[in-house]
Regions:
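Cys/His-rich short segments
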Residues: 4-60
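Structural motif
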Residues: 33, 118-119, 145-146
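Short, surface-exposed charged micro-motifs
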Residues: 45, 112-114, 141
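Anionic N-terminal interaction surfaces
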Residues: 54-115
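Residues that act as N-cap/strand-start positions at coil-to-secondary-structure junctions
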Residues: 107-111, 128, 136, 146
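Short hydrophobic/aromatic-rich beta-strand segments that constitute the beta-sheet cores
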Residues: 122-126, 152
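Acidic, Ser/Thr- and proline-rich intrinsically disordered linker/docking segments
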Residues: 132, 136-194
Length: 194
Protein backbone atom coordinates (compact mmCIF):
# COMPACT_ATOMS: atom_id res chain seq x y z
CA UNK A 1 0.00 0.00 0.00
CA UNK A 2 1.29 3.46 -0.88
CA UNK A 3 0.99 4.93 2.59
CA UNK A 4 4.00 7.19 2.46
CA UNK A 5 7.23 7.95 0.69
CA UNK A 6 10.18 5.58 0.90
CA UNK A 7 13.22 7.75 0.26
CA UNK A 8 16.35 5.73 -0.36
CA UNK A 9 18.82 4.93 -3.10
CA UNK A 10 18.60 1.28 -2.05
CA UNK A 11 14.86 0.55 -1.94
CA UNK A 12 15.13 -2.87 -3.58
CA UNK A 13 18.36 -3.88 -1.88
CA UNK A 14 18.20 -7.38 -0.36
CA UNK A 15 14.71 -8.13 -1.70
CA UNK A 16 16.17 -11.56 -2.54
CA UNK A 17 16.10 -12.39 1.19
CA UNK A 18 12.31 -12.69 0.91
CA UNK A 19 11.54 -13.26 -2.79
CA UNK A 20 12.24 -16.60 -4.47
CA UNK A 21 9.27 -17.11 -6.82
CA UNK A 22 9.24 -15.17 -10.09
CA UNK A 23 5.74 -14.42 -11.39
CA UNK A 24 6.99 -15.45 -14.85
CA UNK A 25 9.41 -18.35 -14.10
CA UNK A 26 8.28 -19.94 -10.85
CA UNK A 27 11.05 -20.91 -8.43
CA UNK A 28 13.94 -18.56 -9.08
CA UNK A 29 16.55 -16.31 -7.55
CA UNK A 30 16.80 -12.55 -7.65
CA UNK A 31 19.62 -10.07 -7.62
CA UNK A 32 19.11 -6.56 -6.32
CA UNK A 33 21.11 -3.38 -6.71
CA UNK A 34 19.92 -0.02 -5.49
CA UNK A 35 16.27 0.42 -6.48
CA UNK A 36 16.19 -2.42 -9.01
CA UNK A 37 16.02 -6.20 -8.85
CA UNK A 38 16.21 -8.84 -11.57
CA UNK A 39 15.19 -12.47 -11.94
CA UNK A 40 18.29 -14.57 -12.58
CA UNK A 41 16.34 -16.91 -14.88
CA UNK A 42 14.26 -14.69 -17.18
CA UNK A 43 16.30 -11.52 -16.67
CA UNK A 44 13.24 -9.31 -16.18
CA UNK A 45 14.13 -6.24 -14.14
CA UNK A 46 11.77 -4.23 -11.95
CA UNK A 47 12.07 -1.02 -9.96
CA UNK A 48 10.94 -0.50 -6.38
CA UNK A 49 9.60 3.05 -6.30
CA UNK A 50 9.43 5.76 -3.65
CA UNK A 51 5.68 5.11 -3.41
CA UNK A 52 6.50 1.42 -2.68
CA UNK A 53 5.08 0.34 -6.03
CA UNK A 54 6.88 -2.20 -8.19
CA UNK A 55 7.20 -1.32 -11.86
CA UNK A 56 8.63 -3.55 -14.57
CA UNK A 57 11.25 -2.13 -16.93
CA UNK A 58 9.69 -2.58 -20.36
CA UNK A 59 6.91 -4.90 -19.14
CA UNK A 60 3.98 -4.87 -16.73
CA UNK A 61 4.89 -6.36 -13.37
CA UNK A 62 1.80 -8.32 -12.24
CA UNK A 63 1.82 -6.99 -8.66
CA UNK A 64 1.66 -3.39 -7.59
CA UNK A 65 3.12 -3.91 -4.12
CA UNK A 66 5.49 -6.42 -2.55
CA UNK A 67 2.78 -7.73 -0.20
CA UNK A 68 0.73 -8.88 -3.21
CA UNK A 69 3.79 -10.59 -4.67
CA UNK A 70 4.53 -12.26 -1.33
CA UNK A 71 0.95 -13.59 -1.16
CA UNK A 72 1.40 -14.96 -4.70
CA UNK A 73 4.66 -16.61 -3.62
CA UNK A 74 2.95 -18.32 -0.67
CA UNK A 75 0.08 -19.49 -2.91
CA UNK A 76 2.61 -20.77 -5.45
CA UNK A 77 4.43 -22.82 -2.80
CA UNK A 78 1.15 -24.10 -1.35
CA UNK A 79 0.09 -25.16 -4.85
CA UNK A 80 3.32 -27.06 -5.50
CA UNK A 81 3.89 -30.72 -4.70
CA UNK A 82 7.43 -30.25 -3.44
CA UNK A 83 7.81 -34.01 -2.97
CA UNK A 84 8.29 -34.19 -6.75
CA UNK A 85 11.52 -32.15 -6.47
CA UNK A 86 13.92 -34.86 -5.34
CA UNK A 87 16.18 -35.38 -8.37
CA UNK A 88 17.50 -31.84 -8.84
CA UNK A 89 17.81 -29.15 -6.19
CA UNK A 90 15.35 -26.28 -6.19
CA UNK A 91 18.06 -23.96 -4.90
CA UNK A 92 21.81 -23.96 -4.30
CA UNK A 93 23.43 -21.58 -1.83
CA UNK A 94 26.64 -21.14 0.08
CA UNK A 95 26.57 -21.07 3.88
CA UNK A 96 28.54 -21.50 7.06
CA UNK A 97 27.27 -24.34 9.24
CA UNK A 98 27.32 -24.02 13.02
CA UNK A 99 26.12 -26.20 15.84
CA UNK A 100 24.10 -24.15 18.33
CA UNK A 101 24.97 -25.09 21.88
CA UNK A 102 21.92 -23.95 23.85
CA UNK A 103 22.64 -21.34 26.54
CA UNK A 104 26.29 -21.32 25.55
CA UNK A 105 27.62 -20.52 22.12
CA UNK A 106 27.94 -21.73 18.55
CA UNK A 107 30.58 -24.04 17.18
CA UNK A 108 31.55 -23.60 13.53
CA UNK A 109 31.43 -26.96 11.75
CA UNK A 110 31.93 -25.88 8.13
CA UNK A 111 32.66 -22.68 6.25
CA UNK A 112 31.63 -21.90 2.68
CA UNK A 113 29.64 -25.10 2.32
CA UNK A 114 27.37 -25.74 -0.63
CA UNK A 115 23.78 -25.95 0.56
CA UNK A 116 21.23 -27.65 -1.72
CA UNK A 117 17.50 -27.49 -1.10
CA UNK A 118 15.38 -30.34 -2.45
CA UNK A 119 11.69 -30.98 -1.94
CA UNK A 120 12.43 -33.56 0.78
CA UNK A 121 15.86 -32.71 2.18
CA UNK A 122 18.74 -30.32 2.59
CA UNK A 123 22.12 -31.50 1.38
CA UNK A 124 25.40 -30.00 2.55
CA UNK A 125 28.43 -30.45 0.30
CA UNK A 126 26.62 -33.11 -1.71
CA UNK A 127 28.87 -35.43 -3.68
CA UNK A 128 31.91 -34.57 -1.58
CA UNK A 129 33.67 -36.79 0.93
CA UNK A 130 32.11 -34.94 3.87
CA UNK A 131 28.58 -34.74 2.42
CA UNK A 132 25.75 -34.39 4.92
CA UNK A 133 22.19 -35.23 3.90
CA UNK A 134 19.45 -33.90 6.18
CA UNK A 135 16.10 -35.56 5.39
CA UNK A 136 13.09 -33.42 6.25
CA UNK A 137 11.61 -36.52 7.91
CA UNK A 138 14.29 -36.27 10.61
CA UNK A 139 13.69 -32.60 11.43
CA UNK A 140 11.30 -31.34 14.08
CA UNK A 141 11.34 -27.68 12.99
CA UNK A 142 12.98 -25.14 10.71
CA UNK A 143 13.04 -21.40 11.40
CA UNK A 144 14.47 -18.08 10.24
CA UNK A 145 16.43 -16.00 12.72
CA UNK A 146 17.38 -12.40 12.16
CA UNK A 147 17.84 -11.22 8.61
CA UNK A 148 19.25 -14.33 7.01
CA UNK A 149 20.02 -17.19 9.37
CA UNK A 150 18.39 -20.60 9.11
CA UNK A 151 18.01 -22.84 12.15
CA UNK A 152 17.16 -26.51 11.79
CA UNK A 153 16.12 -28.67 14.71
CA UNK A 154 17.58 -32.11 14.07
CA UNK A 155 16.89 -34.59 16.85
CA UNK A 156 18.20 -33.02 20.03
CA UNK A 157 20.59 -30.74 18.16
CA UNK A 158 20.18 -27.32 16.58
CA UNK A 159 22.21 -26.29 13.55
CA UNK A 160 22.45 -22.82 12.09
CA UNK A 161 23.18 -21.95 8.47
CA UNK A 162 24.26 -18.43 7.66
CA UNK A 163 25.09 -17.15 4.23
CA UNK A 164 25.89 -13.83 2.67
CA UNK A 165 23.84 -10.70 3.25
CA UNK A 166 21.68 -11.87 0.33
CA UNK A 167 21.03 -15.40 1.66
CA UNK A 168 17.34 -16.36 1.60
CA UNK A 169 16.58 -18.56 4.61
CA UNK A 170 12.82 -18.13 4.13
CA UNK A 171 12.63 -20.50 1.16
CA UNK A 172 14.10 -23.35 3.24
CA UNK A 173 11.46 -22.81 5.93
CA UNK A 174 8.60 -22.57 3.42
CA UNK A 175 9.65 -25.65 1.42
CA UNK A 176 10.12 -27.70 4.60
CA UNK A 177 6.66 -26.81 5.95
CA UNK A 178 5.04 -27.44 2.56
CA UNK A 179 6.66 -30.90 2.56
CA UNK A 180 5.43 -31.46 6.13
CA UNK A 181 1.85 -30.45 5.24
CA UNK A 182 1.83 -32.91 2.33
CA UNK A 183 3.33 -35.76 4.40
CA UNK A 184 0.77 -35.20 7.17
CA UNK A 185 -2.07 -35.41 4.64
CA UNK A 186 -2.82 -31.71 4.99
CA UNK A 187 -2.43 -30.96 1.29
CA UNK A 188 -4.44 -27.73 1.62
CA UNK A 189 -2.53 -26.57 4.70
CA UNK A 190 -1.44 -22.95 4.42
CA UNK A 191 1.11 -22.75 7.26
CA UNK A 192 4.59 -22.38 5.80
CA UNK A 193 6.54 -21.60 8.95
CA UNK A 194 7.59 -18.49 10.80
Amino acid sequence: KADGVFESDFKAEYIERAAYVCPFCGFSEFESHGNEFSCKICGKTAVYGEDKRITGKGFKFPFEFFGEWYDFQMDFVNGTDVTEYTERPLFIDEATVKEVIIRKNKKTLRKNSELLLYGDRIAVDEGKENEWIIPFSELSAVSVLGKNKLNIYYGTEVFQFSGSKRFNALKYVNIYYRWKNIKEGNINGKFLGL
